[in-house]
Amino acid sequence: MTRKTRYLHQITTLILGGLLIVPAAAPPVSADIAATHVYHNHMPNFWAYYDLNTYNSTPVGSPIRYTYDGEVIQLKQNPPAGYPYYLPNGSPMPHDDLVSYYSHHAKTGAYLTWPWSVANTLHSSHPQAQMHVTMSGSVVNNVNSIIQQGNVSGYNNPAWGTPWKNAVTQLKTAGGDNRLDLIHFSGHHSMGPLVGNDYLLKDMIYHGATMAQPYFLGSSYKSSKGFFPTELGFSERIIPVLNKLGIQWSVIGNNHFSRTLKDYPLLDSPGTDTMISPPNRSDLQNVSTAGAWVNEPMFNEQQVVYNKYPFASTAHWVRYVDPATGAESRVVGVPVAQAQSWEEGYLGQVKADALKPYENLVAQKQIFVVAHDGDNSSGRAGSEETWRNAGNVTYADSGVTGMGIDEYLRSNTPAAADVVHVQDGSWIDTRDSSSDPAWYHWHLPFGIWKGQFAAFNQVNGTAYAPKKNLAGVEEGMTVSFEKGYHYLERNFALLQASLNYAKTAEQIWLEEHPNYWKPANPLDREVTYEGNQLNPWMLSYPVKGNPANDYAGGANPAELAWYFLLPAMDSGFGYYDENVDDSVKPALSFNQSLYFSKPYVSQKLAKDKTGPSVWWPQRYPYNPGSANVSKAEGWTLQHYNNAFAIYTYAFDTSGISEIKVKVRAHRDKTADAADNTFKVYDPAGLAAAGIANIDPAKVGAWTEYPMNVRDLSADINGVDWQPSSMTIMQKVPATDIGNLYFSYISDYRDQLLDYFIEAKDAKGNVTQSDIQQVYVGAGKYKLANGKYTESMQGTIEGTHPFITDVPAVPDTEAPAVPANLQATVMNASSVGLSWNAATDNIRVTGYEIYRNGVRIGTTPSTSYTDSGLSASTAYEYRVKAYDASGNLSGFSAAATATTPAGNHVTVYYKQGYSTPYIHYRPAGGTWTTAPGVAIPAAEVAGYNKITINIGAATQLEACFNNGSGTWDSNGGSNYLFGTGTWTYTPTGKIQAGAPVAPSATPTVAPTATPTPKPSVTPTVTPITTPTVAPTLSPTPTVAPTVKPSATPIATPTVTPTVSPTATPTVVPTIAPTATPTTSPSATPVPTATPAGNSATIYYKNTAFSNSYIHYKLDGATAWTTSPGVQMQASTFSGYKAITIPLGSATGLTAAFNNGSGIWDNNGGSNYHFGTGSSSLTGGNLITGEPQADSVTFRVSVPGSTPANAPVYLTGSFNSWNAADPAYLLTRGSDGIYSITLNLPAGSAVTYKLTRGSWATVETASSGADITNRTLTPAGGAQTVTLTVQRWKDQ
């Protein structure tokens, strides 16, 4: 029989009471400690891209491949024609600098030299030692791809796999095991407990097929006995997959053993153990009376790991019981020293000292397993010295023997009855959720971060706020199934759709091909299990099959669907937050998988016998009725009442017709790991069938709860209140997604429960999830000495966990009436309005403007300009406020204004442009915004006509355009029209009076169509648009010599400026007038622009919807007429601009206002501008054009800061992630740490400095916590200088 068959036979024998490896009576063991190392090497397929358009034209038998990393480097350097994926900044996706990644010595050493070199050294000095190493399938293919492409220095040996093969096959331990043991792993770094067993099985088969590729181990590949779970993330749910592939043992984090002991000491100390919630009491199933509890602080970190030795330092059996049949699967669980593994990865060496006090307390030898990355570019994990320190330091220590896991189990296999329960969870140092059994580093229930509520409420028209804990503190994250969102959670909803299509394609294909493929040679059997299945070589390395001949000679649609699906769920895509485009890498693979599975399944849907894909049931909170302090609460300690939710994501190709949660209560408040009663759906039935360890009296009947559904199709590619995430998601839009199903349950208190989800599709196919357990606490608390303690006798009801589980109360409250409406006459044809902001119970979203009782417009701001009015006319204005729900306030008090008499200019324009625009200003006044105003058709055929009120001015300066950038501006000199009526033809001819109607419609277009763009495009300001004055310059009849008693007095509501008491220093009370001595002739001749200096001023003030500059030239006494000259939009976002001729002056003095009495005058000192360009925002005046809004933080740190310690900025802009790599500061040669961020002007942020965790956050010099730092960026380029007084851990 095969090796796998032999092993399964051995397990069966063990279950029946026989022996596996050691005799029933274990011999005495020595007191020394066994020690070994596990090194993890991996790089993702960073961009598993395949041009689907090439599939149909690919010849049969040709390889079908997504890009490995060598090809990705080429793709980024030279994107192919039609390549569709680019970041918002225009660079090709992915963002990753792969050349830099792979060039690091940690990569080249771990992949190309260290492992076999160190194995040779161990071979000569430690006869029982093994190096257990993972080389993921993706990193093997990536390294080979880079060598083939030759695009990374150092990767140049085509036979790079030969030293690996030689070391694996030739170096043996004293017991005959592989010295270099390439243990099992999921090929694409997928986390089995999160992706599910179907996905994990395929990914592990892929890994085996990759190990057996000719460029790596080839035909010499032999399946290892061991397994390393991705991110050290283990669950008993994956044991059937390990058994199916003949795997005998798995490493598991040691604290996941300890957190299942019934004497766990920290249930009432939430957050103490690795900064997460205490274990749910349903996990406390094991008993150990030997040894003691030990707290192990992680080196240089805030987390403290709690373990009980020797229970957490000896191997035990762990098992899975099939809930339908009661059949058992089991493997040996080997504990990994979590804290010490981190320490070696950080410092480069570690000893087994923590275990020495507990030697010889039990029959088994303790084992000290150090497991960490072998290729990590940070810390010391990716160092040859660290690899060698296993033998030089750890195994050289007194009382410690280098002994691989296979060697250890040869004489230390657990007794058959030594079966324990292990808690779900992962590696210890994810920082935000260290080894959390809820896996919150890689997914998070749909929710709303505290800093997102403002945007959430604005988009949804709601008034939600974070709920508060019993101490009155707002939580950092609020779970909301109805309205929340999270990019990581989205991936698991997307997965259910692609997974179900792939599984259904596989089911249909294998049913149609009952003898399709099964292992036929020894290498096949090393890679996969026995029986009819998809071809593992084709789902790992497909070639084109013949679609016209049942895909003969290559991969069928099911194999292609799996091949393209497997790269999707690399856990690294969710490890570093959204990290530019990591969040959409799964969608790329999902879409490519669906390209092959969906059409195939759709054509054969009548043959669907696959049940719905249902993600393993989730619950929130993790500890119902008890204490929780996890990432899902935003690390806010919550003491909840007894309500909780069960939820999942589910999808079926035929549609889900029914889905429900089933819950049953236990008789007792505790359970035991050896008991099978609570592990099966039907205890009575299976007990009657002879399944051992079942007592039906221990559990009650199942109670069914229907599930609510949230259709996620509308949110498949993001939500509007998370715009940055949405922008990236829409670069690679997903196409199919599972829905969210959830049930709220509050019928239990102080009880142990089982639950599972059952779903049925439209064809009657049923899926039942695994059974899980939860202990629902009392939900009531006592308060003593400032601490809340759960108690059924408590008088304080816990906080309700949800805020959107009941329908939102409709907002029917109208905003308050706007006050202080002011109407200011601007000229003969326009009136400016301003008013005080109204208030509302949620938020005012805008205002309706009424003129003479008729609504004329709306605005989101508190000002409005009404244009196009008649001269010498009285107008009455009123304003209403409205909110997002459409509630309207009452009318404001009325404000009236009467326009003065004004001069008019009527222009007939002979059609040269099909839709002509006129861009104009009253001579010396303010220009319209380009392209100006469309000229309506005239009563005279072939002409357009417009009448313009120019107020007191006597001339109109203008040019014409087609609205799309083609201009007629009199060769850059513009046109001048006096008052009265004029006729213009595109030949440049201006004639007094209206045109004479032609006797016949012209049939020929004008001979001179005005197409050239003016030499100075008239788009923004009076200089960048028309600048030329009339031939005869007007002279003022009244000199501007009178100084006002008091000028602008209103204080801006937003802009941080001070209103002057009497500024600007000189403002004329009588506007200068100018009357030309004669009107322009029929063809006016413009005066040349005077030679001299000019000043171009860019001004940004988010409080002003309109900006005016009120100024005087240096050496002059005359100011412009208040409010001055209106500035126009510029090419720089948010900035208004103007260019002012200075003549012989060298500068000007100015103040700014909104045209309605709100001033920015530099605190009463005004601003001074020289020649050339200047930019002003938030009081920050710089020379030159505007710079992008940015803030450079320069941080001085205490002298006690560890050398080269990382310093991070954390705050409202990154959800308070204390170790966000995107906010890592750079240390300069002067010791100053700095980072530059693009923070928008005017948007306040709060923040602090950390060294990578909240244990190392900055404090006051006394060590006391400090309040959050705050900053409202002024705009433009800004530098903030900070000093850290002290770190919390010092």
Curated annotation (Swiss-Prot):
Temperature optimum or stability note: Optimum temperature is 40 degrees Celsius.
Record's protein name: Alpha-amylase
The keyword Hydrolase is assigned to this record: yes
Gene name for this UniProt entry: igtZ
Highest taxon of the lineage: Bacteria
Function: Acts on maltooligosaccharides that have a degree of polymerization (DP) of 4 or more, amylose, and soluble or raw starch to produce glucose and maltooligosaccharides up to DP5 by a hydrolysis reaction. Also acts on maltooligosyl trehaloses that have DP5 or more to produce trehalose as the major hydrolysis product.
Bias (Low complexity) ranges: 994-1008, 1016-1031
Signal sequence interval, chain numbering: 1-31
One CC-aspect GO term: extracellular region
Location(s), subcellular: Secreted
Residues in Fibronectin type-III domain copies: 817-902
Coiled-coil segments on the chain, per record: none
Top EC group: hydrolase
Catalytic activity: Endohydrolysis of (1->4)-alpha-D-glucosidic linkages in polysaccharides containing three or more (1->4)-alpha-linked D-glucose units
Active site: 231 (nucleophile), 373 (proton donor)
Residue ranges annotated for the CBM20 domain, each copy included: 1183-1289
GO molecular function, one term: starch binding
Region described as Disordered: 994-1037
Stored SUPFAM superfamilies: Fibronectin type III (SSF49265), Glycoside hydrolase/deacetylase (SSF88713), Starch-binding domain-like (SSF49452)
Entry-linked InterPro entries: Carb-bd-like_fold (IPR013784), CBM20 (IPR002044), CBM25 (IPR005085), FN3_dom (IPR003961), FN3_sf (IPR036116), Glyco_hydro/deAcase_b/a-brl (IPR011330), Ig-like_fold (IPR013783)
Stated pH dependence: Optimum pH is 6.0.
SMART domains associated with the record: CBM_2, CBM_25, FN3
